[in-house]
Regions:
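Rossmann-like flavin
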Residues: 2-67
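FAD-dependent oxidoreductase catalytic-site/capping-region signature
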Residues: 223-254
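Mid-domain catalytic core of redox enzymes
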Residues: 116-231
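Glycine- and acidic
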Residues: 54, 78-86, 245-254
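Glycine-rich phosphate/pyrophosphate-binding beta-alpha loops
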Residues: 56-61, 172-174, 245
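Helical element adjacent to the flavin cofactor pocket in flavoenzyme catalytic cores
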Residues: 73-129
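General beta-strand structural signal in soluble alpha/beta enzymes
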Residues: 50-51, 111, 143
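Redox-cofactor-proximal catalytic regions of oxidoreductases
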Residues: 1-18, 59-89, 230-239
Length: 254
C-alpha cells in the first residue's frame, strides 16, 4: 500500500523498516532518540509521516508530538509487523497468565490495600506503609500511579531535587457504545481498529477544548476473529480521543 500511494517514498520506507528490525529495543542503556528525527532520515512526506505516527502515538506515547525512537520501534513492530489480535475475554486472559507466572516465581498479590506512604531511608525507598498500618519492606518498588502521585507519597530521607516531576499534558476520553446487535449489521463489519485524523497535520498534543475530535481511535471488538462459534455477547464500539484533563476535573459530578 505504501508503494501504491507513496511511490516516491517506498525506498525510504523500506530503509525505515530495516532500521526498525535491526534496532535493539530491549536495551536498557540505549540513549534517548527522537522518533520524529529517526523517521525523517528515511521518509520526507509529511502525510506518510503522520500516518505512521498516528497509530503509534495513540497506543504508545505519553509525550506530545514526538516519542522515543525505542518506543516507536516497539509499537511499529507490534502494530505494523505483527498486527492486532484480541482474546475473546479481553485483557483478562493475559493478566491471568501473568499472575500465574508471578505466583510461580514466589510472588504474592494483595488486593484492596492502599499505600498510605512510601518510606525513604538512606536516600532510597525502603518500605511501604499500607492503609491499615502494615509495613512492607522491599529493595525495589515499582509504582504505576504516576510520577507526581508517587512522589507525593514519599516521606523520610529524600534526596534534594526529588518530588518535582510535573504532571504530563496528555489525557484521553473514551466512549463505549453497547449495542443490541452486531456492529456489522450497521455497516461496520470490515474493520477492527481504525485510526483517524481529519486535520491537515496530525496534532498529538493537549487540546484547548474538552475533547479534540479531529483524531482518535475507533475499536470494534466484535470484528476480531475469535474462532468458529465464538462471539461477544453484545455489540461494542469504543472511540478514544485526546482530552484536556484540567477542564474535565473542573466539571461538576452531575
Amino acid at each position: 500500500e505504501v508503494a501504491a500511494r507513496f511511490p516516491t517514498q517506498i525506498d525510504g520506507f523500506r530503509a525505515l523498516v530495516a532500521a526498525v528490525r535491526s534496532f535493539d529495543d530491549v536495551s536498557l542503556d540505549a540513549p534517548a532518540l527522537s522518533a520524529r528525527e529517526g523517521v525523517r532520515r528515511h521518509v520526507n512526506d509529511p502525510l506518510l509521516e503522520d500516518m505512521l505516527f498516528c497509530p503509534l502515538m495513540y497506543y504508545g506515547s505519553a509525550t506530545e508530538r514526538d516519542m522515543d525512537f525505542g518506543q516507536f520501534v516497539i509499537m511499529f513492530k507490534a502494530l505494523f509487523l505483527e498486527g492486532f489480535a484480541r482474546p475473546l475475554e479481553g485483557v483478562r486472559v493475559i493478566l491471568r497468565t501473568l499472575l500465574a507466572k508471578y505466583r510461580a516465581a514466589g510472588g504474592e498479590r494483595r488486593m484492596k490495600c492502599g499505600v498510605r506512604r512510601i518510606e525513604a531511608r538512606g536516600g532510597r525507598v525502603a518500605a511501604l506503609i499500607l492503609d491499615d498500618g502494615t509495613e512492607v519492606t522491599a529493595r525495589q518498588v515499582i509504582s504505576s500511579i504516576g510520577a507526581p502521585e508517587t512522589e507525593r507519597l514519599i516521606t523520610g530521607d529524600v534526596p534534594n531535587g526529588q518530588g518535582t516531576t510535573p504532571a504530563g499534558n496528555l489525557s484521553f476520553v473514551e466512549t463505549i457504545s453497547v449495542l443490541n446487535r452486531e456492529p456489522a449489521e450497521l455497516g461496520w463489519g470490515g474493520d477492527t481498529i481504525v485510526f483517524f485524523n481529519d486535520s491537515e497535520r496530525f496534532d498529538y498534543s493537549r487540546p484547548q477544548e474538552d475533547v479534540d475530535t479531529r483524531s482518535g481511535v475507533i475499536c470494534i471488538p466484535n470484528n476480531f476473529e475469535y474462532g468458529a462459534g465464538r462471539r461477544l455477547p453484545e455489540g461494542l464500539v469504543r472511540v478514544t480521543c485526546l482530552a484536556r484533563h484540567d477542564r474535565w476535573t473542573a466539571m461538576p459530578e452531575e
